[in-house]
Every structure is written in C-alpha cells, then in structure tokens.
Amino acid sequence: MKIKKQNIVLSILLSSIFLEGLDAFSIFAVPFPWFGVSMLLLIIPTYYVFNFDLTSLNFGSLKYWILYVLTVTIIKAFSFDLEMPQYATSTYSQFISLRVTKIISFFIVVWIIQFLASYLTKDQIIEYIAYIGVIISVLSLYSYFSFFLDFPDFNRTRAGSGGWSQPIQRACSVLRNYGTFREPSFLAVWTVPFIPLNFYLARKNNKWYFLSILPILSLILTRSLTGVISVLVACLVVLLVYLLKTKKLKLNFVY
C-alpha cells in the first residue's frame, strides 16, 4: 500500500510533540525531547525523497527572523562564558547545537503546518495535535494519583533542576503534579497551549468539553502560578481575537 507523503510528515510532527512531552525520560543518557526535536530534521531528507513542492508556501518575514536569531545565537556562542550550570547534563557545544536545532525546528514546524493545510482541514490538524495533549495529561494524572492509590510511578531517568530525581511525594512541600516532566512548572507551561485547542474543537464536537477536563485538571494539580497565569492569558488572547474577528465581520456586514 502506498504511503501518502502527508501521513509521513504528520507522523513526524506528532511523534516529535509527544517526545517533547516525555521530559523526565532519557535513553542512553539522551533525553527524549532531544529525539523529538531531532526528528523534525528528518523533514529535510524527506523533502528530497518525495520532492515536496514548496512554491505555494509563504513564509513571509519569518525566514528573516529565523536567520537573525541563528546569527545572534552563533555570535553570542563565541563570546559567552563557557562555564555551564552546576547540574547541567550537556557540554557547552551540545547546548549550542541543541539551541540551533530548536530554532531550525521551529521553522520546520511552521513549514509542516502549511504543508499539511494543503491536505487536511484546519480542524483536523488541531485535533491530531490536541490528542497528544490529552495523552500526556492522562499520563501525568496517573503519576499524580499513583501516590494516593499506591500504584507504581514512572521510573524517571532524568534529574530535576536540583540535581536529584524527584519522587512525587517529595516534589514539593505540598503534593504537586509533574507527570512526565522534571518540574511541575514544566508540565504546566507545556499543557497550557492545548487547553484553548480543546475548547476550539468543542464548538463542533461536545466530547472535547469532556476531554478538556484532563489538561485543565493536570494544570491545576501542578499548583504552578506560572501555568495558571499562562492559561488565563492564553484564553484572554483567544477571546480578544474572537471578538475582534466578530466585530470586523459585523462592520463589513454594515458597510
């Protein structure tokens, strides 16, 4: 059976996002998020193998911004103090390489979304991505309630920012949800963008109102002020954009 090229691109995107959500794990001392970011670079050979057409894609001024950020990063790399933080698990060269890869991967994700928009509807793309948020939220809730239900928690293979692994009962002075991440705040910030996506999808399918409970509960249990503020700001921005679009439509109708 012939594999459609858009399915390959979609699989790479979703796998990358999922691996980014497994922040607390590594294999052969390589963190899963690093694999996730590196997977996006597979788009480059895939582009040549399947001869993707880029003529219809419009990156506008984004490519110039990416070039600027890359230039600043490389220049600063030579003038920065080479001493890494005490609990850093990577060398300075690895840190710079990962940062450059992150910047390039951002550009690749924008390209992927534009490419997929030629084959899938906007709602389909959002739904695929939203399911990743639901899966990570379920895993985080399992980890959190494993303490109460005496279930085995995940065997995390990466240390937290304090330099030691964090069993859930001592994650903080109060029990906090950090799920598949090394810190509760990391989980909170990662979860926030998925909540508006759930409510967007709920406009046409009520099941997303139910599914939105999972990332919201996961966020609340992190007890992260940063995460709560982030979701409030995100919802405010979404509401503002919606109101502006509605107002614009009404003005166009009047005139």
Spans of model-derived segments:
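Alpha-helical transmembrane segments of multi-pass inner-membrane proteins
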Residues: 126-154, 168-245
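Alpha-helical transmembrane segments and terminal signal-anchor/GPI-anchor hydrophobic tails
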Residues: 245-255
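Membrane-embedded alpha-helical segments of multi-pass membrane proteins
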Residues: 31-51, 96-108, 187-195, 229-236
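N-terminal hydrophobic segments of proteins, predominantly signal-anchor/transmembrane helices
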Residues: 6-25, 40-108
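Juxtamembrane membrane-water interface segments that cap and precede transmembrane helices
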Residues: 18-27, 89, 164-180
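Transmembrane helix-loop junctions and nearby membrane-interface residues
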Residues: 18-28, 73, 77-84, 141-151, ...
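Interfacial loop-to-transmembrane-helix boundary motif in multi-pass membrane proteins
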Residues: 6-10, 61-70, 104, 110-154
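Structural signal for the C-terminal ends of transmembrane alpha-helices
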Residues: 43-56, 111-122, 198-204, 236-247
